[in-house]
Amino acid sequence: MMTLFMDHDSEHALDQNLIGRIVEAAIMAAPQPLSITQIYALFPDDEPAPVGSVERAISELQQSCDERGVELIEVASGFRFQVKNEVHNWV
C-alpha cells in the first residue's frame, strides 16, 4: 500500500517510500552527518517533505538495519551510517 502525503500549500504529493529512499541516499552520500534540518532542506519549496516524514524515514531506516552490517546512528551533528561493531573486524 502506498502512503501519500499532501502538503496543504501544494498540489504535489510525495510518497513516504520515495522520501525514505531520498533520505537514505542523502545520508549515504554525505561526507559528514546530516541533521534533520539539512535533510528537510533537500526538498524543494514546491515539493516539500511533509512534517514528520523525514523523522519517520529515519526511524524506518534504523529498523531496516537491524539485520545488516551497518546501522544508522545519530551523533551530535546529525545522522550517519556506520559499520556495526559486530562486523567491524572484517571491514
Task: For each feature predicted by the language model, list its residue ranges.
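Phosphate-centric recognition/catalysis
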Residues: 1-12, 18-19
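Charged low-complexity interaction tracts in eukaryotic proteins
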Residues: 2-7, 59-88
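Alpha-helix N-cap/helix-initiation sites
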Residues: 16, 32-33, 50-51, 72
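Pre-recognition alpha-helix immediately N-terminal to the DNA-recognition helix
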Residues: 21-25
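Short acidic/histidine-centered micro-motifs embedded in hydrophobic/aromatic stretches
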Residues: 26, 42, 57, 75-78
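Short capping segments at the starts of secondary-structure elements
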Residues: 26-35
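A short acidic, leucine-rich amphipathic alpha-helix
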Residues: 35-42
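Short amphipathic alpha-helical interaction segments
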Residues: 49-60
